[in-house]
Every structure is written in C-alpha cells, then in structure tokens.
Amino acid sequence: MKTYLVRYSEIGLKGDRERARMERILADNIINYYKKIGYEARCQLLAGRLLVEAENDIPLSKVFGIKSYSECIRIKFENQEDIVKKVHALYEEKVKGKTFGVRCRRTGTHSFTSIDMEKAIGDALYSISNGVDLKSPEVWIHVDIVGKDALIYDKIYKGPGGLPLGSEGKLISMVSGGIDSPVATWLMMKRGSPCDIFFCSLADPIDTQAFLEIAKKLVERWSPYRDGNVFIADCRDLIRDMVIEKKTNFNNVTFKKVLYRLAERLAEKYRYLGIVTGESLGQVSSQTAENLLSIEHGINFPIYRPLIGLDKDEITAIARDIGTFPEKNVGEFCSLFSAHPVTRSKWEDIEEDVKKIDIEKFIERVTAIKFSEIGKIVINSDLMLNKNLEDAVFIDLRKKDLYEKSHYQGARHLDLEQALAINDTSKKYVFYCSMGLQSAYVASVLRERGIEAYFTTFSKLSKQKGSVDETIGKRV
C-alpha cells in the first residue's frame, strides 16, 4: 500500500462543525471511489489534511474537494537528525548533479523551526548536487511535519478542487448530447451538489445514444460511487406540435420553456433544490437576457447557470479537460427550431405559447434509470445508414437553397412536414440533413409506421465519389 497526502482548501475555512462534516464526506467519497473500482483504501485525518493508504492514486485526481495530493513517505521521528538522515537516504541519488530546493511545513511544537529543517537538509545534500535553486529547481523536496510524523514527498498533483460531492443540496440538471450542459453539471458537482440528469429526446434512439455516451463519461469518471437518477423524456411529439402543426409562435424559446416546466415537475416530485442548465449569455438565440427572463419566469425553483459568463472556447476547454467533449455531434434542438428564431421575447407571449402544449403528456413519457444502468442500455443503431441502398429513395431535408446548390445524386427535397406525411411501406427511404438530428427524427417516426427508413448526413454522403450533383443556380 502506498501513502498519499491529500490537501483541501475551502473545507479548512469552515467552522469546526461544518469542517468536520465535510471532512467525513470527503473521506467517505475517497474510500467509496476506490471500492467502486475494485480497491481498498484507508483514510486518516491529520492536522487539516487526509492521509490515504491505497494501491494507486486513480481516484484522487477526480474526487471533488481535493485541492492537490502527493505520494509520500511517512516516518516517525524523535529529533531533527532522524528526518535529515531519512531524506538524505531517499534523495541522495535523485539530486546527484542536479539543482534542488527544500520546503518544510510544521504543525505542533518542536525544538527546531521550519527554516532550521530546510537548512539542515540542504546542507546534507548540497555537496552531491548542482546547487540550491529555490525558484525552479530540478528536484523539489517537501517535508510536512505533524507532531512526531514527517511526510516526505517531491511531487504535487492537482485535484479538481471545490467541495465534497454530497456536502450541498441535490439538483436536477438539464443535459443534452452537446458540449455545454455536461460542463455545467460538472461545475455544480464541483460545488458539492449531487446532480441527477434530465434529457429530452427529440430523435430517439439516436440522440439518446449520444446523450448516454456523455452521461456515462461524466458519471463513471467523476461520481462512480453515487447511483443517481437519469430521466429521459420522449419529446418527439413536440416537433409535431410546434413545427408541423404550428401550435406555437416562438419555437426556439418556447421549446426551452417546456423543458424547464418538465424539469420543474421532476424537481417537485423528487425534491430537488434547483435546476441546472448549460446556458451562456448570448451564445445562441434562446440565450439572450430577454429570452432567459421569459424561459425562467414562473419557474418555482432556483435556476443555476454556472456557464453564464463563459465563452464557448472556455467551455470547450473544460469539456475536453473533464472528458465529456462529444466524439460526434448529432446536432441539438436549435437545428429543428432555427427557421425564425426570436431573440427579444416577452414572457407573456411565451407563457401563452406553453399553454398550447400538453405538458402532462410528456411527463407521462419520462423514463427513469439509475446511473449504474447507463452502461447496460443497448441502443438500436439500425436507423443509421451503414450499407449501400441503391434502390432507396433519398430525401434531402436541408433548406431549399442548400439543396439547390448541391445534393445527393437523385435525391428529392422535402420539408419536415412533407417527409412525415410519407406512408408508402413498399419503398426504402434514406433521409439526410446537415447535422443528422432532423433526419434521425423522421427515420424514427417512419420506422414506427413499418417503413424501412434510415438517416445520415449530407457530409457523409458527399464522401462517396460522384454522388453529389453541383447545381448552383438551377433546380434538378
């Protein structure tokens, strides 16, 4: 078993009772993370730090509340010379011909000061080294002294920081298959709030598959010791209500308000303390200040938007760092509601729009699964085109001007309403669009009618040699 010195920052600023509570939660989370991945671990509180005994450090870079950690050698000592001898034995070879520096921290009463210890170790190693450098040495030697214990180490690894998961109240997070919302969820988890996840599927099973892949990464990496809930709502009929039947007038904003209402109902039922979203001010049309007011108006729970002031580049960098950046993009809802986006809505208009949507219908279509079940769900990806279908009818769902500029050879152009009206079961159909979400939605609806339908994207079809007609300025 190895010994790791684990440091935290904010926990140490709390009052005695709250600090003790958070330290217990942090220690439990560390032990449970190790247990979840098949290892045993022991934790001991030592003067505002934790000592962890385990076979490896896999969980320590991923447990919220850990500021940093170091693999260390722990020794008992009687006097200063005991420590100097041990450090000399450990670092004689490591500092040979190299510059080095020594840093000592003490807790307790001793016959020597921290500076005394640094000088003594420096004197013992100086003759075999290339000198002392206290700015950027080739080898750092750290000695933390607590009572009669000395912890010796030379490397410091970064943890995620924040507060221990479970030290704050439980939230429900609206997560998509995109970049932003998983990052928002992670940031609230970092602040100590366990987050259960709510997802609205518009093109099941394709967008559900993309969402589950990201949710699995988020959960397995950052909270495998917590078996929370995932709620998946089948919202395909929203597209019919809003786009085909045109029941609503401000689709890009009204859609988000409907999602807020669904999340609100789940928060009421499961006693969540707030709703987390991945909105960043002004990033897309539904995220202007006016539209966020309209979306949030009348929601009886706090809305947490940890990304509100971040640029897309900053969000993307965090997504890559925490491992939730999507490997493939199937598009998000905005591609279905982007025809005439409203950027300066009035909350009264959005409320009237929402009244035209049967919220109860979609609440009844919510499926709940546990985090531990995510990896067991097998999505049927047969909808995705992965074979040659020369006898199929190809349908282009992109905007008409894009179709007229270039399209798959022999493809017909249909809008969403026309495509959904297809009822000929004797033919095979391949639908394509720019991002894949609209085509996946149409294919899934037609499959339920017994029609052999597939989906793909224009870019994938374009890679086939001689498959694209370039028809700029005229119709085919």
Curated annotation (Swiss-Prot):
Question: Where does it localize?
Answer: Cytoplasm
MF annotations from Gene Ontology: ATP binding; CCA tRNA nucleotidyltransferase activity; tRNA binding; tRNA-uracil-4 sulfurtransferase activity
Indicate the residues that form the catalytic site: 433 (cysteine persulfide intermediate)
THUMP domain sequence ranges: 54-156
State the CDD domains in the record: THUMP_ThiI (cd11716)
Give the enzyme class: transferase
Disulfide bridges in this chain: 334-433
Which GO biological process annotations does it have? thiamine biosynthetic process; thiamine diphosphate biosynthetic process; thiazole biosynthetic process; tRNA 4-thiouridine biosynthesis
Q: Where does ATP bind?
A: 174-175, 256, 278, 287
Q: What keywords does the record list, in alphabetical order?
A: ATP-binding, Cytoplasm, Disulfide bond, Nucleotide-binding, Redox-active center, RNA-binding, Thiamine biosynthesis, Transferase, tRNA-binding
Reactions this protein catalyses: [ThiI sulfur-carrier protein]-S-sulfanyl-L-cysteine + a uridine in tRNA + 2 reduced [2Fe-2S]-[ferredoxin] + ATP + H(+) = [ThiI sulfur-carrier protein]-L-cysteine + a 4-thiouridine in tRNA + 2 oxidized [2Fe-2S]-[ferredoxin] + AMP + diphosphate; [ThiS sulfur-carrier protein]-C-terminal Gly-Gly-AMP + S-sulfanyl-L-cysteinyl-[cysteine desulfurase] + AH2 = [ThiS sulfur-carrier protein]-C-terminal-Gly-aminoethanethioate + L-cysteinyl-[cysteine desulfurase] + A + AMP + 2 H(+)
Task: Note the InterPro entries from the entry.
Answer: Rhodanese-like_dom, Rhodanese-like_dom_sf, Rossmann-like_a/b/a_fold, ThiI_AANH, ThiI_fer, ThiI_N, THUMP_dom, THUMP_ThiI
Q: Which residues form a coiled coil?
A: none
Give the enzyme's EC designation.
2.8.1.4
Pathway participation: Cofactor biosynthesis; thiamine diphosphate biosynthesis
Q: Which GO terms describe its cellular component?
A: cytosol
* Domain Rhodanese stretches: 388-470
Family assignment? Answer: Belongs to the ThiI family.
- What does it do? Catalyzes the ATP-dependent transfer of a sulfur to tRNA to produce 4-thiouridine in position 8 of tRNAs, which functions as a near-UV photosensor. Also catalyzes the transfer of sulfur to the sulfur carrier protein ThiS, forming ThiS-thiocarboxylate. This is a step in the synthesis of thiazole, in the thiamine biosynthesis pathway. The sulfur is donated as persulfide by IscS.
The protein here is known as tRNA sulfurtransferase
